[in-house]
Structures are given as structure tokens and as C-alpha cells.
Amino acid sequence: SIDSIDECFILSTCNRVEIYVSSKVKSVDAELIKFISNFHKVKIDNSSITYQFMYGKDAAYHLIKVASGSDSMLLGEPQIVNQIKESYKIASTAQTIGKSLHKLVQVSLFAGKKVRSETSLGNRVDSIGSLVLKLSNKLFDNLRERSILILGTGEISQILISKPKIYIHSFSN
């Protein structure tokens, strides 16, 4: 743990890891990088990993954009809502969520829902997994007669595996 951090919420998806913290100290950047580096036993410097820090309203606005699907690889991608909820649940279980981050997550989910319901982002129902399946169907004749190898067991793999009558082999280390 980091003494200067009061609350922590980690959002991890297939293409992002975001760490939201609440602290009475103005900047915990160096402490956070040092903690992650020590925890994972890797050296983190500007050339080895891309990271950025946001503070206050910028960080809150960013999570709202993420929750609305407007900051996704696939614009409007709906899976992020469940990923935020699951990350929140994990942080709650670990007792790292307090009043500040609880409010931030709830406001972000509410705002994200409002954006989806009042804009065209809500009309986009495809996930990356379903788009992969659609593209595969276009590229290959009769996909149901083919075997598919999926490396990994992430959320996209789970979506592909759940499709009926398609023979899929999934491997992960």
C-alpha cells in the first residue's frame, strides 16, 4: 500500500489499465510508479511504458468518457460498463473504495448511461468480439465448418467462445 493514497480503483480492460486514486497529497505520481515497478519487479521509465496522469476534473471527465464508450477503440463499445462495474466490485471487496471514488464511479456510470441513451452511441451494440465474428463470416465461406484458434481467455475470447455451433479452440498460458 501507499500511505499517501486514501482510495484506489483500478480499471483494467483489453487495451487499458487505469488507476484512479484519491489522496490528500497533491501528487502521488512518483510513489505510484515506484509501487507498480516494485510490485511487478520491472523498471518503469519513459521509454518502457506509456503513461499519463490526470487530476481532479480532468480525471473525472475522462472516466465519464470511458463509461460512455466515447473513449474506446470501438466507439460506443458497450462492454466497458460491465468492466467498470466489475472493477468497482473488486475495489469494494478489497475495501479500497471510499466516498470520493464511490461518487466518481456512480456519477460516471450515470453520465455514461445518459450519453448512451440520448446520443447515437447507444445505437452501437457491437462489441469487438462480435465484430471479429462478423468479419470472419465475411472473410471465410461457411465459418461453421471451420475450426478457430483463439489465444487468450479474455473477455473477447469469452464472447467468441459463447457463440453456438462454431468450433473454437482456446489456449492461454
Residue ranges and their predicted role:
Residues 46-146:
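Glycine/serine-rich phosphate-binding loop and adjoining beta1-alpha1 elements at the start
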Residues 36-37, 91, 164:
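Hydrophobic alpha-helix position signal
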Residues 133, 137-173:
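Glycine-rich phosphate/diphosphate-binding loop of Rossmann-like nucleotide-binding domains
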Residues 5, 114, 168-169:
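A broad structural signal for short, well-ordered beta-strand segments within beta-sheet-rich domains
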